[in-house]
């Protein structure tokens, strides 16, 4: 469809995780890290050296894990468009209007293993972790990098 909005709808918060559910996600992350370290320790010396070189050349292949952040809340999200961990995101709902959240104030967590993702998009099961206390159904938007004021873009949909 045509749009002249400066924003892209990026995701919807579908569920606020309970403290127990948050702890399960953090345990999943911890278990993943332990398994990754154990696998590394069981490698042959030359394989360890190769892994360390690869980690230096391609750090994105070895994501950090989520760790507890005091005072933060974890939410299951339904991603609709790409969100990057370098984006400034905004939360919008009936009780909040455009709360900006800088990249340092949120994390994207992979729901399968508890690692921190650098990006997420449609069909990636994931969580947003942030100090913002939000309600279910809150929308997450990002600024459209292709936005031009006064120009309506037709995507052909």
Regions flagged by a language model, labelled:
Residues 1-157:
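Surface-exposed amphipathic alpha-helical tracts and adjacent flexible/coil segments at the periphery
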């Amino acid at each position: 469809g045509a749009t002249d909005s400066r924003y892209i709808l990026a995701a919807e918060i579908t569920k606020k995780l309970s403290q127990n559910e948050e702890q399960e996600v953090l345990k999943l992350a911890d278990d993943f890290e332990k398994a990754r370290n154990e696998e590394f320790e069981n490698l042959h010396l030359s394989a360890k050296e190769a892994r360390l070189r690869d980690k230096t050349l391609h750090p994105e292949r070895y994501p950090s894990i989520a760790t507890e952040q005091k005072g933060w809340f974890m939410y299951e999200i339904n991603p609709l468009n790409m969100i990057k961990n370098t984006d400034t995101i905004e939360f919008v709902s009936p009780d909040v209007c455009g709360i900006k959240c800088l990249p340092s104030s949120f994390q994207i967590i992979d729901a399968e293993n508890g690692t921190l993702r650098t990006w997420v998009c449609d069909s990636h099961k994931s969580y947003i972790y942030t100090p913002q206390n939000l309600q279910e159904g809150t929308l997450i938007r990002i600024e459209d990098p292709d936005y031009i004021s006064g120009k309506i873009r037709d995507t052909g949909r």
